[in-house]
Amino acid sequence: TGYSFPVEREEFLFITSPFGTRQDPLDGTKQQMHKGVDIRCKGDAVLATENGGKVVAVNQNKNTPGGKSLTVEYARTDGSKVQCTYMHLKEISVKVGDTVQAGGRLGTSGNTGTRTTGEHLHFGVKNIYADGTKRDIDPAAYLAEIAQKGHIKLQMLHNGNDLLAKYKAAEDTVPEKNLSPDGWMKK
């Protein structure tokens, strides 16, 4: 279909930590901004989310906060770009400069890095506007767009709540169906 979620699931992605401010999992006395979602995984293939993505970064050093990680960039017609970052990987199957397609295998989930408490995929999304401004966005907003365009019927569940619901609700009440994740973030 040209669209995929970052891991394959039958019904839902189990989110262990959503986007936003949280208690630091490694130091409970501190708050931190979590710039992604943590998806429960166990040796899962991690997948490209759209067609025509370009691998723009690969980190094979497991002794960094995000461990083995990679970033795929997708260009938009308005000159902006979306970057999807996958962290804590066990293994990476792509190299910088590779072009990837939706559902294509990028690597395998793992537990690498100095900022992890167990195996999971940290999936982060960043908008880069045409003027070069960068902004971390809620991956649920981005994946709601992917779900809509790709007719993907999965949920992203955290504590029993579907994190996609607020973005799906917005899609049903707005006549303009092609809102960007950033457009949803401003609602």
Where are these regions (language model features)?
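Non-catalytic extracellular/periplasmic "stalk"
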Residues: T1-S4
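Structural detector for hydrophobic anchor residues on beta-strands
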Residues: E11, A45-L47, N51, V82, ...
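Short glycine/threonine/proline-enriched tight-turn/helix- or strand-capping micro-motif at secondary-structure
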Residues: F14-T49, E73-Y74, H120
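A residue-level detector for short acidic-glycine micro-motifs
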Residues: S17, C41, A57, H88-E91, ...
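Zn2+-dependent peptidoglycan hydrolase active-site motif and core
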Residues: Q32-K35, T49-S93, T114, G118-G124
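Active-site scaffold segments
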Residues: G36-D38, A102, G107-T108, H120-K126
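Short, well-structured beta-strand-loop connectors
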Residues: V46-A57, V94-S109
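Acidic, glycine-rich catalytic/binding loops that coordinate metals and/or anionic ligands
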Residues: D98, G124-K187
